[in-house]
Amino acid sequence: MSNKGQTLQDPFLNTLRKEHVPVSIYLVNGIKLQGQIESFDQYVVLLRNTVTQMVYKHAISTVVPARAVNFQVDVPAE
């Protein structure tokens, strides 16, 4: 993944994690997962509900927070 994609993805996921925002994660096959983001890295998201699931990012279509969130994007100077 390009670094530019990470500049949006990481602050968004980190805000959801730090603020314990409930999320719905839709997978590319249509399955809906719900829970809170416990952690994430370049390839996976750990989603906690009654159990913790490791969800590979390439399988994720959409992440929908249960409420609006504000997050800061640090745009590197070019």
UniProtKB/Swiss-Prot annotation:
- Domain (Sm): give its ranges: 10-69
InterPro entries reported for this sequence: Hfq (IPR005001), LSM_dom_sf (IPR010920), Sm (IPR047575)
Highest rank taxon of the organism: Bacteria
Pfam families for the chain: Hfq
CDD domains from the UniProt entry: Hfq
* Alphabetical keyword list: RNA-binding, Stress response
Biological process (GO) annotations held by this record are: regulation of DNA-templated transcription; regulation of RNA stability; regulation of translation, ncRNA-mediated
- UniProt KW RNA-binding keyword: yes
- What is an example of a GO molecular function annotated in this UniProt entry? RNA binding
Task: Show the disulfide pairing.
Answer: none
Q: Cross-referenced PROSITE patterns, in alphabetical order? A: SM
Q: Which GO terms describe its cellular component?
A: cytosol
Q: Report the function annotation for this chain.
A: RNA chaperone that binds small regulatory RNA (sRNAs) and mRNAs to facilitate mRNA translational regulation in response to envelope stress, environmental stress and changes in metabolite concentrations. Also binds with high specificity to tRNAs.
Among PANTHER family, the record links this protein to:
RNA-BINDING PROTEIN HFQ
Subunit organization: Homohexamer.
Indicate the family of this protein.
Belongs to the Hfq family.
Its name, as the record gives it, is: RNA-binding protein Hfq
- The protein's organism comes out as Bordetella petrii (strain ATCC BAA-461 / DSM 12804 / CCUG 43448)
Gene name for this UniProt entry: hfq
